[in-house]
Amino acid sequence: MSTLSRKQKTQKRHKRLRRNLSGTDQRPRLAVFRSNNHIYAQVIDDVAQNTLCAASTLEKEFLSNSKVNASTCAASTAVGEMLAKRALGKGIKQVVFDRGGSLYHGRVKALAEAARQAGLTF
């Protein structure tokens, strides 16, 4: 039996991912954080160390337009579409996807596919 908790395993995977993954001004990093109740996504330029745009299930835009629970795949899809729209508005078309140590499945996958369909390429 493993002595690492689920959170520690996620942090270990995220460290391993971030070793080879960084965003630039031409191709920023799309970072996803998934909690039990919400999902957050940011487009980050690691060279300049600033966030170019962000979206989450805690925003007024999401809460006022959506009648779905924030911890569902439908909510993640809405966040992915919001983020892609904001990124395209700032002229960002290509990103590097950072799943944040979470498995590419469920809510993380729904956010990524929605962002792709809205126009981001990765």
Swiss-Prot record:
**Which intervals carry biased composition (Basic residues)?**
1-19
Q: Which CDD domains match?
A: Ribosomal_L18_L5e
List, alphabetically, the SUPFAM superfamilies matched. Translational machinery components
Return any one Pfam family short name.
Answer: Ribosomal_L18p
Q: Which domain of life is it from?
A: Bacteria
* Keywords, sorted A to Z: Ribonucleoprotein, Ribosomal protein, RNA-binding, rRNA-binding
Provide a Gene Ontology MF annotation, just one: structural constituent of ribosome
Give an example GO cellular component term for this record: cytosolic large ribosomal subunit
| One GO process term, biological-process aspect | translation
According to the record, the residues making up region (Disordered) are 1-26
Its family remark reads:
Belongs to the universal ribosomal protein uL18 family.
NCBIfam families reported in the protein's UniProt record: L18_bact (TIGR00060)
HAMAP family tied to this protein? Ribosomal_uL18_B
State the function annotated in the UniProt record.
Answer: This is one of the proteins that bind and probably mediate the attachment of the 5S RNA into the large ribosomal subunit, where it forms part of the central protuberance.
The record describes its quaternary structure and partners as: Part of the 50S ribosomal subunit; part of the 5S rRNA/L5/L18/L25 subcomplex. Contacts the 5S and 23S rRNAs.
| Protein name per the record | Large ribosomal subunit protein uL18
Q: Say which species the protein is native to.
A: Prochlorococcus marinus (strain SARG / CCMP1375 / SS120)
From which lineage does this chain's organism come? Answer: Bacteria, Bacillati, Cyanobacteriota, Cyanophyceae, Synechococcales
What gene is this protein translated from? rplR
